Amino acid sequence: MSQSAVSFQINSVSKVQEQLIQQKINLKTKPLGALGQLESLALQIARIQGADQPYIANPTMLVFAGDHGIAAEGVSIAPSEVTRQMVQNFAHGGAAINVFCRQVGFKLEVIDCGILTPIEGVKGIIDQRLGAGTGAIHLEPAMALETVDKGFAMARDLIERHHQAGCNLVAFGEMGIGNTSAASAIMAAIMQLDVIDCVGRGTGINQETLARKLMLIELALLLHQSALTGPKEVLACLGGFEIVQMTGAMLAAAERNMLVVVDGFIATAAALVAVTIAPNVRDYLIFAHQSDEQGHLRMLEFLQAKPLLSLGLRLGEGTGAALALPLIQAAVNFYNQMASFSDAGIEAVV
């Protein structure tokens, strides 16, 4: 363990009020379970907040960006330069995530965790660089173990700033050419799966590129096999700067009893690491959607997660998490505002 190791103290969400919360849901003017997954979501949120009137305040979308050494081997449909171009697009408001955040009321913040070349003089990009792209994981570790802890510390400070500003819900998105390779490698290492069960086509690669991607990830796992002794070591050997900071931010948000909305395949890989580090994190995670990346369903099942949406998305950026916000708000609103049978003078049908 590095001398500057960062640790998190995350409480398990109390079940003391669970029966009362469930009773309140059951007594709304509807048949039992008629609001489906919104009911379990309302129960989760009310348990996390421990409040009679749960609420969403200053919802914030954090998009973490970083480049990957493995991308130089052509494992994606786009070169690494596109990461930087998309980060600029985020800053100028032109990406899908910008459109959706404006629509649903998310504050959007973009974090440069380590793209190849920094973007200077552009408002709206937070500098939390850990380097200029990771090492190529099939040849060397992605980063030093100390860099993982540095990323965790940066992420904790980021979350603390938003918590102090009154945010109680944070969603996670990402941008990084090659990061499905890193996420697949992390998944294979932690879940002890064959690489072929973890690797998909990312943003739409062809069969030849997929075969190369599979081979390189298998090489990476073989190269680092003896070093993969824990979740931080998995991040150091196989991860990305953006995945490291997402993981740390999820841990920090759970530590502050915030709601954590997880986007797609890459964000779920970060959640997988976070839960491996601190299992209590799982109580705070809301999984926005099931993406079209083939390994995502396996990860969701491993985490016993039922996502809110299944739209065939495979873009990343936090787009699925943004689209889930109205559903999260609907769960809170029905819990707070919907009449009970006694309030409405209706004979109970429970």
Curated annotation (Swiss-Prot):
InterPro entries: Nict_dMeBzImd_PRibTrfase, Nict_dMeBzImd_PRibTrfase_bact, Nict_dMeBzImd_PRibTrfase_N, Nict_dMeBzImd_PRibTrfase_sf. One of its GO terms (biological process) is cobalamin biosynthetic process. Its EC number is 2.4.2.21. The active site is at 317 (proton acceptor). Pathway: Nucleoside biosynthesis; alpha-ribazole biosynthesis; alpha-ribazole from 5,6-dimethylbenzimidazole: step 1/2. Keywords: Cobalamin biosynthesis, Glycosyltransferase, Transferase. It is an enzyme of class 2 (transferase). It holds the Pfam family DBI_PRT. This is Nicotinate-nucleotide--dimethylbenzimidazole phosphoribosyltransferase. It comes from Shewanella putrefaciens (strain CN-32 / ATCC BAA-453). It comes from the Bacteria. Catalyzes the synthesis of alpha-ribazole-5'-phosphate from nicotinate mononucleotide (NAMN) and 5,6-dimethylbenzimidazole (DMB).
